[in-house]
């Protein structure tokens, strides 16, 4: 397995776009209609667009700092050098927590949707066993190489996009304006539930662990990597918009309360959509799409965790070194998935809390420190100090929202 560095033939732009897009657009999107049902469609779209803007720029700030270090340097190296040991420990804990808990969430989600898929074929496969088997398959692909993940993600994302448009093209045809505009509730309030959506929005635009992986893939080519981040995140925003239209235009707002009470996992939402549409072919497409959605996100997130742990522990890129990294990457979340198979919605929410440190606060601090030391000779994010301040406020604000929510100090749609 060769280390990926800049070569005479540069990898295609599409490979990087699908790594970013595939990481973002995955199982996390299934939580959005459930947690956004209180704020409903238009307020939720405002939250998504604002979050997309902030998360894109925080990723660009990571790139700005990363370009001043050797290819293969991950957050551990960069944060320790620019911000010191204290911030490095805090950042390291938040990275490990986010990536581990997202890996656990996708094991939970894969077990749930595979159990539902096998049930459609009259096969009884327990969710725990299905999630465990799927995790082993993903572990093998990640162990092979970054290029293997890129190629597999490209295949899965391609299949996911095809099934997405087949499924949601049909779903959009069933959208009821009265349902989307929530005509049935004449005195409904939406704005009070807006803050609750922000940590989930943040978790649904998580790709930051893959920025160092892209530098490994393309070398120090900021122009190409910036395009990967912009196109990948825009792809996610577009598909989230279609997803919210398709779900909130078909499932009445009050029905989401029952979906949330059942844990909000993928199979519950798929069953709710199937019940509304009463279409066997659409039901099958939904199930197929759900499987591809989990697979692409699972691959991207675990690649980020894999590269971070390899850098942290100094494991080399040999078969044995990658095996050690793979064991550290997958063993803890697999155990969690076997013990607690239904924690998807809770895991996504807590990932949003920890991700505020790693995906918003620390990137802004890295950009500021990098400019002071290096002057950002290769690439600089536009906006100057005000942009850094905005990303910091965004991160701290998200953390406060989640803490207030944990103590039941924010209104909940129920």
From Swiss-Prot:
GO terms for molecular function: L-tryptophan transmembrane transporter activity; symporter activity; transmembrane transporter activity. It is found in: Cell inner membrane. Residues 37-41, 110-128, 173-193, 250-285, 408-414 are periplasmic. InterPro entries: Amino_acid_transport_2, Trp/try_permease_CS, Trp_tyr_transpt. It comes from the Bacteria. It is a multi-pass membrane protein. GO terms for cellular component: plasma membrane. Residues 1-15, 63-88, 150-151, 215-228, 307-325, 368-386 are cytoplasmic. Its main location: membrane. Induction: Induced by phenylalanine or tyrosine via TyrR and repressed by tryptophan via the Trp repressor. It catalyses: L-tryptophan(in) + H(+)(in) = L-tryptophan(out) + H(+)(out). Keywords: Amino-acid transport, Cell inner membrane, Cell membrane, Membrane, Symport, Transmembrane, Transmembrane helix, Transport. The chain crosses the membrane at residues 16-36, 42-62, 89-109, 129-149, 152-172, 194-214, 229-249, 286-306, 326-346, 347-367, 387-407. One of its GO terms (biological process) is tryptophan transport. NCBIfam families: araaP (TIGR00837), PRK10483.1 (NF007789). Involved in the transport of tryptophan into the cell. Belongs to the amino acid/polyamine transporter 2 family. Mtr/TnaB/TyrP permease subfamily. This is Tryptophan-specific transport protein. The lineage of its organism: Bacteria, Pseudomonadati, Pseudomonadota, Gammaproteobacteria, Enterobacterales. The gene is mtr.
